[in-house]
Amino acid sequence: MDSPSGPRVLSSLTQDPSFTTSPALQGIWNGTQNVSVRAQLLSVSPTTSAHQAAAWVPFPTVDVPDHAHYTLGTVILLVGLTGMLGNLTVIYTFCRNRGLRTPANMFIINLAVSDFLMSVTQAPVFFASSLYKKWLFGETGCEFYAFCGAVFGITSMITLTAIAMDRYLVITRPLATIGRGSKRRTALVLLGVWLYALAWSLPPFFGWSAYVPEGLLTSCSWDYMTFTPQVRAYTMLLFCFVFFLPLLIIIFCYIFIFRAIRETGRACEGCGESPLRQRRQWQRLQSEWKMAKVALIVILLFVLSWAPYSTVALVAFAGYSHILTPYMSSVPAVIAKASAIHNPIIYAITHPKYRVAIAQHLPCLGVLLGVSGQRSHPSLSYRSTHRSTLSSQSSDLSWISGRKRQESLGSESEVGWTDTETTAAWGAAQQASGQSFCSQNLEDGELKASSSPQVQRSKTPKVPGPSTCRPMKGQGARPSSLRGDQKGRLAVCTGLSECPHPHTSQFPLAFLEDDVTLRHL
């Protein structure tokens, strides 16, 4: 219980014109109910200047056992090392392998960058302060530490949301994404993600809330303990637009992704096919459910990592900060920072092309993952080429991918699509074009080599002009531009004899790169 004279002494301190309490000292007072800590703050004479007060008790300690500091310090060190090594491996592998540098994978690289910076700026500082059982880096260091944790944490959350929205559009609305998958557009989205994170991380520097010590006073965060309208308003808006709204968007996107996959699976089940065809469709559905499970794990880990920290802040927001102990503030902060080690495992190590790239560029890690780059490369190339051949021959929407296929891990990696996404997007495109998913004859034995398209390279794709080709009916696609000076609607020839231009009929312009075109033999 606090000393009865505590409020009167604190009032005398704040009323003295020579004493100006800093946000850090206010945060210490508001963030702890420990008698010894508040006694250190109240022991300052009313006539002491602000500079002398800061030098006397800049960051007092919490009366907890030493092993509590050492345990948290060890955990945060292990989390930081794992996050740094894991995310650095992701960044290195994606940068070394050209086939992985696709617009879709740029989101994963951005996620790895933000998580890497989170681990670098948080773990060493937290660990050092835990060893000495007090904050070592002063008020400026406290503000910088908390700012880095905020901006990199928010960036990771919003990047996860951008990934979910990107997969949602690609799978459920493939025609709407025509012409929108460029690296430049993705870079603009990522720039918006970082600006959004900065917009919510900078206000404490300008008086809207503050960055103060928290928990065991060996780390810092924004002030969520002070029960004032200004601080409560910032806390409420921060959680609404940084935690709850992104979480709702992620859940919404993956619900519709699951529904698209399920509808595609039902369309396959309704077809009277041979046992070989049914077995392949069943394997495809198993792959789809595997992706669904990975998405579910992403959402659960996202919630589990940040829910404890959010709960603590919301308890203080509701006015019950007096029931919070130092442990209840520090432990959730460590759990939230541990989210930096989840994303490399989920989004990268489970990515088949990434696993092969690790085996190629980091053979030692490839052995640990049980992947051989030399053995996996041909099979992936064959599978990707095989699927491109099937789709370009049998459908009015040919999912064309990639540049320099011999140098990449396969056409699939160029676009950044998984088998599941291709299948679900295929089904959605068939429904949009008014055709049955089952009407496409995709059996290997039913495809003749003489009818397969031949890949030819050209600097600028040749696309049929509106004067000689009819627009494709039922698609409604209006791509604004195409590389090369080609613009216009999605078009298709009614017959090769009616169009003098050599080109592949019936393809979405969005998936045609600047150096690869398909031409008829």
Swiss-Prot record:
Q: Which residues carry this modification: N6-(retinylidene)lysine?
A: K337
Q: Which GO terms describe its molecular function?
A: 11-cis retinal binding; G protein-coupled photoreceptor activity
Which stretches of this protein does UniProt put in the Extracellular compartment? 1-71, 128-143, 209-237, 315-329
What is one term from the GO cellular component aspect held by the record?
Answer: plasma membrane
Q: Which organism is it from?
A: Mus musculus (Mouse)
Q: Report the protein's function.
A: Photoreceptor that binds cis-retinaldehydes. Contributes to pupillar reflex, photoentrainment and other non-image forming responses to light. May be involved in the optokinetic visual tracking response. May be involved in the regulation of retinal hyaloid vessel growth and regression.
Q: At the top level of its lineage, which domain of life is listed?
A: Eukaryota
Q: Which gene encodes it?
A: Opn4
Q: Does the keyword Glycoprotein apply?
A: yes
What are the alphabetically sorted keywords of the record? Biological rhythms, Cell membrane, Cell projection, Chromophore, Disulfide bond, G-protein coupled receptor, Glycoprotein, Membrane, Photoreceptor protein, Receptor, Retinal protein, Sensory transduction, Transducer, Transmembrane, Transmembrane helix
Subcellular location, record wording: Cell membrane; Cell projection, Axon; Cell projection, Dendrite; Perikaryon
Q: Where is this region: Disordered?
A: 445-486
Concerning InterPro entries, the annotation shows: GPCR_opsins, GPCR_Rhodpsn, GPCR_Rhodpsn_7TM, Opsin, Retinal_BS
Provide a GO biological process annotation: positive regulation of circadian sleep/wake cycle, sleep
UniProt keyword annotation of GTP-binding present: no
**Topology class, membrane:** Multi-pass membrane protein
Q: What ranges are annotated Cytoplasmic (topological domains)?
A: 93-106, 165-187, 259-293, 351-521
Bias class Polar residues marks the residues at 449-458
Please list the tissues where expression of this protein has been recorded: Expressed in the retinal pigment epithelium and ganglion cell layer (at protein level). Also expressed in amacrine cell layers of the retina. Weakly expressed in vibrissae, and tail.
Q: Which PROSITE patterns match?
A: G_PROTEIN_RECEP_F1_1, G_PROTEIN_RECEP_F1_2, OPSIN
* Transmembrane stretches, start-end: 72-92, 107-127, 144-164, 188-208, 238-258, 294-314, 330-350
Belongs to which family?
Answer: Belongs to the G-protein coupled receptor 1 family. Opsin subfamily.
- Name the chain's protein: Melanopsin
User: What follows loss of this gene?
Assistant: Mice fail to show a pupillar reflex, photoentrainment of the circadian clock and other non-image forming responses to light. Newborn mice show normal hyaloid vessel numbers and normal vessel cellularity, however vessel numbers are increased by P8. In Opn4 and Pde6b double knockout mice optokinetic visual tracking response is abolished.
SS bonds (residue pairs): C142-C220
Residues annotated as glycosylated are: N30, N34
